[in-house]
Swiss-Prot record:
GO molecular function: dUTP diphosphatase activity; magnesium ion binding
Its job: This enzyme is involved in nucleotide metabolism: it produces dUMP, the immediate precursor of thymidine nucleotides and it decreases the intracellular concentration of dUTP so that uracil cannot be incorporated into DNA.
Gene Ontology BP annotations: dUMP biosynthetic process; dUTP catabolic process
Alphabetical list of Pfam families matching this protein: dUTPase (PF00692)
Catalytic activity line of the entry: dUTP + H2O = dUMP + diphosphate + H(+)
Cofactor annotation: Mg(2+)
Annotated residues for binding of substrate: 64-66, 77, 81-83, 91
Biological pathway: Pyrimidine metabolism; dUMP biosynthesis; dUMP from dCTP (dUTP route): step 2/2
Gene designation: dut
The protein's name in its UniProt record: Deoxyuridine 5'-triphosphate nucleotidohydrolase
Record's keyword annotation contains Cytoplasm: no
């Protein structure tokens, strides 16, 4: 699939698969200088990239597992959704859950990008559902787990 990408900064790096069968493309920080993320704070990290996502798709932005577990750095709105009609710079929000400052440097792999199919619903309003299920309207904790 071809997806058009604009480099908004000359030092921006394209998304990269680390293995042939990886689902997520690594996204890199695009910085002119180091960014210090203090404990408990969220910072928006620029990628220097803008995308023209085909209409029937969207991107999901997720944490990289090693980056998150080793550094206690998370994406607070994970998974983040990038809609096909957005043309601005891809910015990655990072939350520092650690006890000390974390330094983000240019080129650091900070997130994963997944390409997802977008489904559009044709909502039909009904007064009741035609089928009944064993669970019914039982919600939180109703299955005992």
């Amino acid at each position: 699939m071809k997806i058009f990408v604009q480099k908004l900064r000359p030092n921006a790096e394209l998304p990269l698969l680390q293995t042939k069968q990886a689902a997520g493309y690594d996204i890199h920080a695009c910085l002119d200088s180091k960014l210090v993320l203090e404990p408990g704070n969220v910072g928006l990290v620029p990628t220097g990239l803008s995308f023209a996502i085909p209409q029937e798709f969207h991107f999901e932005i997720r944490p990289r597992s090693g980056f998150s577990t080793k550094n206690r750095i998370l994406i607070p709105n994970s998974p983040g959704t990038i809609d096909s009609d957005y043309r601005g710079e891809l910015m990655i929000p990072l939350l520092n859950l650690g006890d000390s400052s974390f330094i983000i440097e240019h080129g650091m792999r900070i997130a994963q990008l997944l390409i997802r199919k977008t489904w559009y619903a044709d909502w039909e309003l009904v007064s009741e559902f035609a089928d009944r299920t064993e669970r019914g309207a039982n919600g939180f904790g109703s299955t005992g787990h």
